[in-house]
Protein backbone atom coordinates (compact mmCIF):
# COMPACT_ATOMS: atom_id res chain seq x y z
CA UNK A 1 0.00 0.00 0.00
CA UNK A 2 1.26 3.49 -0.89
CA UNK A 3 0.68 6.24 1.66
CA UNK A 4 0.64 10.02 1.39
CA UNK A 5 1.22 11.62 4.78
CA UNK A 6 -0.58 14.89 4.20
CA UNK A 7 -0.40 18.25 5.88
CA UNK A 8 -3.14 20.72 4.90
CA UNK A 9 -2.05 24.28 5.71
CA UNK A 10 0.57 25.31 3.18
CA UNK A 11 -0.19 22.27 1.02
CA UNK A 12 -3.88 22.44 0.12
CA UNK A 13 -4.14 26.13 0.89
CA UNK A 14 -1.97 29.25 1.09
CA UNK A 15 -2.11 32.60 2.84
CA UNK A 16 -4.06 33.84 -0.20
CA UNK A 17 -6.63 31.04 0.27
CA UNK A 18 -7.13 32.07 3.89
CA UNK A 19 -7.76 35.69 2.89
CA UNK A 20 -10.32 34.71 0.23
CA UNK A 21 -12.23 32.38 2.55
CA UNK A 22 -12.16 34.90 5.39
CA UNK A 23 -14.01 37.40 3.23
CA UNK A 24 -16.34 34.72 1.87
CA UNK A 25 -17.26 33.59 5.39
CA UNK A 26 -18.10 37.21 6.26
CA UNK A 27 -20.37 37.46 3.20
CA UNK A 28 -22.16 34.25 4.22
CA UNK A 29 -22.32 35.44 7.85
CA UNK A 30 -20.53 32.30 8.98
CA UNK A 31 -17.85 32.14 11.66
CA UNK A 32 -15.25 30.48 9.47
CA UNK A 33 -15.02 28.50 6.29
CA UNK A 34 -11.97 26.29 6.24
CA UNK A 35 -10.01 27.14 3.10
CA UNK A 36 -9.00 24.29 0.86
CA UNK A 37 -7.98 25.29 -2.63
CA UNK A 38 -9.89 23.23 -5.20
CA UNK A 39 -7.02 23.33 -7.71
CA UNK A 40 -4.62 21.87 -5.16
CA UNK A 41 -7.11 19.09 -4.47
CA UNK A 42 -7.05 18.26 -8.18
CA UNK A 43 -3.25 17.98 -8.01
CA UNK A 44 -3.59 15.66 -5.01
CA UNK A 45 -6.23 13.62 -6.85
CA UNK A 46 -3.85 13.13 -9.77
CA UNK A 47 -1.14 11.80 -7.43
CA UNK A 48 -3.61 9.48 -5.71
CA UNK A 49 -5.01 8.14 -8.99
CA UNK A 50 -1.61 7.47 -10.55
CA UNK A 51 -0.13 5.77 -7.47
CA UNK A 52 -3.20 4.23 -5.83
CA UNK A 53 -2.08 5.93 -2.61
CA UNK A 54 -4.08 6.31 0.58
CA UNK A 55 -4.10 9.61 2.47
CA UNK A 56 -3.07 9.74 6.11
CA UNK A 57 -3.65 13.15 7.63
CA UNK A 58 -0.69 14.55 9.60
CA UNK A 59 -2.02 18.09 9.80
CA UNK A 60 -2.95 19.55 13.17
CA UNK A 61 -6.41 19.64 11.58
CA UNK A 62 -6.61 15.90 12.26
CA UNK A 63 -7.60 16.95 15.78
CA UNK A 64 -10.95 17.98 14.26
CA UNK A 65 -11.75 14.26 13.86
CA UNK A 66 -12.18 11.17 15.97
CA UNK A 67 -11.79 7.66 14.67
CA UNK A 68 -14.68 5.32 15.43
CA UNK A 69 -15.09 1.84 13.93
CA UNK A 70 -12.34 2.62 11.40
CA UNK A 71 -14.23 5.70 10.22
CA UNK A 72 -13.24 9.34 10.65
CA UNK A 73 -15.98 11.40 12.26
CA UNK A 74 -15.70 15.21 12.03
CA UNK A 75 -16.02 16.91 15.40
CA UNK A 76 -16.87 20.38 14.11
CA UNK A 77 -17.43 22.60 11.09
CA UNK A 78 -13.75 22.59 10.13
CA UNK A 79 -13.72 18.80 10.03
CA UNK A 80 -16.90 18.81 7.94
CA UNK A 81 -15.43 21.39 5.55
CA UNK A 82 -12.36 19.20 5.06
CA UNK A 83 -14.40 16.03 4.46
CA UNK A 84 -16.77 17.84 2.07
CA UNK A 85 -13.85 19.28 0.07
CA UNK A 86 -12.26 15.85 -0.24
CA UNK A 87 -15.57 14.17 -1.14
CA UNK A 88 -16.23 16.66 -3.95
CA UNK A 89 -13.10 15.29 -5.64
CA UNK A 90 -13.65 11.61 -4.81
CA UNK A 91 -10.81 11.76 -2.29
CA UNK A 92 -10.96 10.23 1.15
CA UNK A 93 -8.85 10.30 4.25
CA UNK A 94 -7.74 6.76 5.07
CA UNK A 95 -6.41 7.52 8.54
CA UNK A 96 -4.86 10.11 10.86
CA UNK A 97 -1.52 9.96 12.64
CA UNK A 98 -1.45 9.56 16.42
CA UNK A 99 -0.70 12.54 18.64
CA UNK A 100 2.84 12.97 19.97
CA UNK A 101 3.00 14.94 23.23
CA UNK A 102 6.07 16.76 21.90
CA UNK A 103 4.11 17.65 18.74
CA UNK A 104 6.87 16.34 16.48
CA UNK A 105 5.35 15.29 13.19
CA UNK A 106 8.19 12.89 12.40
CA UNK A 107 7.48 10.99 15.62
CA UNK A 108 3.78 10.81 14.74
CA UNK A 109 4.59 9.39 11.30
CA UNK A 110 7.01 6.89 12.86
CA UNK A 111 4.33 5.74 15.33
CA UNK A 112 1.81 5.33 12.51
CA UNK A 113 4.27 3.31 10.40
CA UNK A 114 5.12 1.08 13.37
CA UNK A 115 1.42 0.26 13.79
CA UNK A 116 0.77 -0.31 10.08
CA UNK A 117 3.13 -2.85 8.58
CA UNK A 118 1.37 -3.17 5.22
CA UNK A 119 3.01 -0.05 3.74
CA UNK A 120 4.98 -0.55 0.52
CA UNK A 121 6.04 3.07 0.08
CA UNK A 122 5.17 6.53 1.34
CA UNK A 123 5.76 10.22 0.88
CA UNK A 124 5.20 13.22 3.11
CA UNK A 125 3.69 16.37 1.64
CA UNK A 126 4.27 19.27 4.03
CA UNK A 127 5.27 22.93 4.01
CA UNK A 128 7.57 22.48 7.01
CA UNK A 129 10.69 20.41 7.52
CA UNK A 130 10.93 20.73 11.31
CA UNK A 131 10.67 17.29 12.87
CA UNK A 132 10.95 15.61 9.49
CA UNK A 133 14.74 15.60 9.17
CA UNK A 134 14.88 11.78 9.09
CA UNK A 135 12.45 11.74 6.17
CA UNK A 136 14.09 14.21 3.75
CA UNK A 137 14.13 11.65 0.92
CA UNK A 138 10.36 11.13 1.38
CA UNK A 139 9.44 14.82 1.71
CA UNK A 140 7.66 16.87 -0.94
CA UNK A 141 8.10 20.40 0.44
CA UNK A 142 5.53 23.07 -0.35
CA UNK A 143 5.15 26.70 0.75
CA UNK A 144 2.22 28.63 2.23
CA UNK A 145 3.40 32.18 1.55
CA UNK A 146 2.25 32.86 -1.98
CA UNK A 147 -0.79 32.09 -4.13
CA UNK A 148 1.34 30.09 -6.56
CA UNK A 149 2.71 27.96 -3.75
CA UNK A 150 1.12 25.13 -1.85
CA UNK A 151 0.87 21.85 -3.74
CA UNK A 152 1.44 22.67 -7.38
CA UNK A 153 2.04 21.04 -10.73
CA UNK A 154 5.81 20.78 -10.09
CA UNK A 155 5.16 18.55 -7.09
CA UNK A 156 3.03 16.01 -8.97
CA UNK A 157 5.90 14.33 -10.86
CA UNK A 158 8.15 14.36 -7.80
CA UNK A 159 5.47 12.69 -5.69
CA UNK A 160 4.68 10.05 -8.31
CA UNK A 161 8.37 9.21 -8.85
CA UNK A 162 8.98 8.85 -5.12
CA UNK A 163 5.93 6.61 -4.66
CA UNK A 164 6.79 4.42 -7.65
CA UNK A 165 10.41 3.79 -6.55
For each feature predicted by the language model, list its residue ranges.
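C-terminal cap/substrate-recognition subdomain and adjoining C-terminal extension
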Residues: 74-165
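Alpha-helical substrate-recognition element adjacent to the catalytic core
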Residues: 2-100
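Hydrophobic/aromatic side chains embedded in well-ordered alpha-helices
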Residues: 1-3, 120-121
Amino acid sequence: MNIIFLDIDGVLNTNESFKKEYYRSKELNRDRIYPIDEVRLLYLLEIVKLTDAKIVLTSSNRLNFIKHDNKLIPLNGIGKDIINSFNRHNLSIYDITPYDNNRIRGNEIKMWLENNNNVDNYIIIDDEEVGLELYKDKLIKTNINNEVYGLNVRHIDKAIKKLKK
